[in-house]
């Protein structure tokens, strides 16, 4: 396994030291050059005698500058090695890019896989199914009514035989006035029901008529007795029987009329009407004065 030498040498301490040295050298080199120039110029103006630095001093300065430059070049080489794009580094970058692309694809595919797993889990029966609660009686009745009347509660209106006869009679006498829509609106049924009634010739039998009359008579008695209990009607007697609708319709038989004999008036109770200013007429005379 190949190990990069530059990466071995690169540590945090070395990098900080290199940066610090470069800053110091740049400052020192600039200051030394400026100082030497200022010193030489000042000496030239102050005295006519020329002074020259010794060879040993110049050699020491040159060695110091060369050492600093070599250190700078070494640091620059390290940085260039790190930042340079070699074939190995390009291959590594390609691998890294491939790995990142694969990771992104995996991340994108994870939600789909999770959804599929969630769907599969939902299709599978639960391990601990919840116990079904016992439904209330009204809930059972409501469900039964909904199943029975899916379109809602719209009961059919059943017309009595009298209404059927009335519809046929009105249409037969005045068909222009009592049309099918008018009859449907009047009797609160559909026009189709009116058409069927007009086409049919159904009539109730005698037994059905008799049962219907008995039912209505019983209903009349119950209503009247209830109103008597509430005090809205007086007890039924002869004076109420005279104006009874049931008697007029023939539901009640008329009682036999009792004949009362008139008693003759007695002479004592006979009243004699006479005028005091006139004399009584003789018994034998029949003339009128």
Swiss-Prot record:
It is found in: Mitochondrion. Residues 92-116, 264-281 have a biased composition (Basic and acidic residues). Pfam families: Neugrin. Keywords: Mitochondrion, Transit peptide. GO terms for cellular component: mitochondrion; nucleus. Residues 1-58 form a transit peptide. It comes from the Eukaryota. Required for respiratory activity and maintenance and expression of the mitochondrial genome. This is Required for respiratory growth protein 9, mitochondrial. The lineage of its organism: Eukaryota, Fungi, Dikarya, Ascomycota, Pezizomycotina. The gene is rrg9.
């Amino acid at each position: 396994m190949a190990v990069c030498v530059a990466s071995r040498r690169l540590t945090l301490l070395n990098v900080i030291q290199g940066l610090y040295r470069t800053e110091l050298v740049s400052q020192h080199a600039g200051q030394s050059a400026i100082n030497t120039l200022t010193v030489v110029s000042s000496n030239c103006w102050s005295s006519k005698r020329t002074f020259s630095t010794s060879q040993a001093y110049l050699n020491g300065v040159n060695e110091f500058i060369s050492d600093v430059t070599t250190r700078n070049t070494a640091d620059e080489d390290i940085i260039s090695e790190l930042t340079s794009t070699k074939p190995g580094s390009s291959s590594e970058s390609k691998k890294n890019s491939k790995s990142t692309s694969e990771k992104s694809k995996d991340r994108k595919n994870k939600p789909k896989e999770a959804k599929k797993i969630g769907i599969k889990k939902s299709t599978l029966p639960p391990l601990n199914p919840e116990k079904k609660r016992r439904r209330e009686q009204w809930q059972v009745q409501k469900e039964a009514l909904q199943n029975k009347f899916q379109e809602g509660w719209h009961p059919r209106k059943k017309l009595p035989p009298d209404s059927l006869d009335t519809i046929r009679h009105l249409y037969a006498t005045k068909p222009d006035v009592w049309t099918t829509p008018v009859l449907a609106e009047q009797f609160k049924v559909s026009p189709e029901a009116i058409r069927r009634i007009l086409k049919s010739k159904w009539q109730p039998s005698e037994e059905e008529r008799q049962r219907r009359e008995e039912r209505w008579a019983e209903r009349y008695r119950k209503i009247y007795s209830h109103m008597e209990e509430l005090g809205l009607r007086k007890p039924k007697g002869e004076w109420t029987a005279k104006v009874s609708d049931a008697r007029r319709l023939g539901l009640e038989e008329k009682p036999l009329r009792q004949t009362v004999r008139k008693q003759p008036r007695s002479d004592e109770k006979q009243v004699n009407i006479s005028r005091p200013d006139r004399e009584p007429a003789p018994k034998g005379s029949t003339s009128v004065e």
